Structures are given as structure tokens and as C-alpha cells.
């Protein structure tokens, strides 16, 4: 009788362990696919300028790791698809710059803090891809993603970090943009 109970306990324990392993696997698969989006054929990189100088280059989807206010940004895109990346920043002069920056040009004067940014794609890039981006500041933390030349930032609160992703239009990228910009 005792031997039978012992075998039953072992069997129940094995079943519970197998169930937990299967559950963990299922959760990892579901959560792991959350941000699996199509980015083939795109090489996006960007770096920011702070009072410490230029950061390292960040790749598609990486968060910039700087801890100081962003004073300038360069964004490059390398692809066989026809088109350019364009971007503009909102700084201390309380307006966006007069001219957009393109394909690796510096946006921002490297002296004034940036409060907002808008990023877009042109030509066939615009037809095939969306560009998502979000900014971080001490007051609001990470703002929601915005896309395709909409403003990200909080007017009057300097941007400290940025994250940029180029994603094929038919990808399943879950984002919300209820609070992507404040005061613009």
C-alpha cells in the first residue's frame, strides 16, 4: 500500500513538472513572437550626440543607451529599395528645423536640447515599410511608439533616449500610440 502511494506521488510529480515545462515553453513561444516582425533587406543605424560626444551606432530596434540629453541625431538606412530616410527635430528654438535631414546627416545643432523628433521614409521605402520610433525623457519615461513622420516627444522636456524600428508594412507589430507626443 505504501509502495503504491509512493509511485502515485512520483507519477503526479512528473505530470506536474511536465505540465509546467509545457506551460513555460508555450508562454515563451507566444511572448517571443510578440515582436517578431519582418525587417529583411533593411540596415538601419543611428547614433545620438550628447555633451559627451557621439554615441556608438545603434541598429534597427535597439534603444540608445545614453544618459544625457540628446543634442543631435544621425540616422542612416542601407537598402536596395529606392528611397531615403528623412527626419527633423524640435529644439530650444521652439520650432522644428527649417530643413529636414536625410540619410546620415546630423539633425540638431549639437548645442540645444531636443524635445521632439519626426522620422519618415520616402519613395518605395515608404510604400513597403513603416518606421516606428519612441522617445524617453525623465518626466514621462518611454512615450508610446509613433510612426511615419508623426512627432514623438514632450514639448519642453528634453529627450534622453530614442528607439527606432523599420518594419515591413504587413508585419504584425503590436504598439499603441495613445501618448506618443505631448504639447505639439
List each model region and its residues.
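N-terminal Sec-pathway targeting helices
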Residues: 2-19
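Residue-level detector of intrinsically disordered/flexible regions characterized by low predicted structural confidence
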Residues: 9-11, 30, 78, 167
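Generic short N-terminal amphipathic or hydrophobic helices
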Residues: 1, 9, 23-26, 166
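Short, flexible coil/linker elements and helix-boundary hinge sites characteristic
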Residues: 7-9, 32, 53
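Sec-dependent signal peptide cleavage junction
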Residues: 23-40
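Lectin-type carbohydrate-recognition ectodomains
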Residues: 35-184
Amino acid at each position: 500500500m505504501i509502495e503504491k502511494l509512493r509511485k502515485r506521488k512520483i507519477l503526479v510529480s512528473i505530470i506536474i513538472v511536465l505540465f509546467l515545462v509545457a506551460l513555460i515553453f508555450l508562454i515563451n513561444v507566444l511572448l517571443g513572437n510578440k515582436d517578431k516582425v519582418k525587417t529583411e533587406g533593411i540596415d538601419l543605424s543611428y547614433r545620438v550626440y550628447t555633451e559627451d560626444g557621439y554615441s556608438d551606432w545603434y541598429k534597427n530596434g535597439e534603444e540608445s543607451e545614453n544618459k544625457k540629453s540628446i543634442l543631435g541625431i544621425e540616422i542612416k538606412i542601407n537598402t536596395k529599395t529606392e528611397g531615403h530616410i528623412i527626419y527633423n527635430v524640435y529644439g530650444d528654438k521652439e520650432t522644428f528645423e527649417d530643413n529636414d535631414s536625410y540619410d546620415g546627416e546630423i539633425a540638431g545643432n549639437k548645442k540645444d536640447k531636443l524635445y521632439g523628433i519626426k522620422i519618415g521614409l520616402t519613395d518605395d521605402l515608404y510604400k513597403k515599410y513603416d518606421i516606428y520610433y519612441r522617445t524617453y525623457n525623465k518626466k514621462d519615461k518611454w512615450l508610446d511608439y509613433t510612426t511615419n513622420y508623426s512627432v514623438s516627444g514632450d514639448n519642453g522636456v528634453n529627450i534622453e533616449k530614442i528607439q527606432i524600428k523599420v518594419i515591413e508594412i504587413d508585419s504584425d507589430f503590436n504598439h499603441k500610440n495613445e501618448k506618443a507626443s505631448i504639447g505639439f
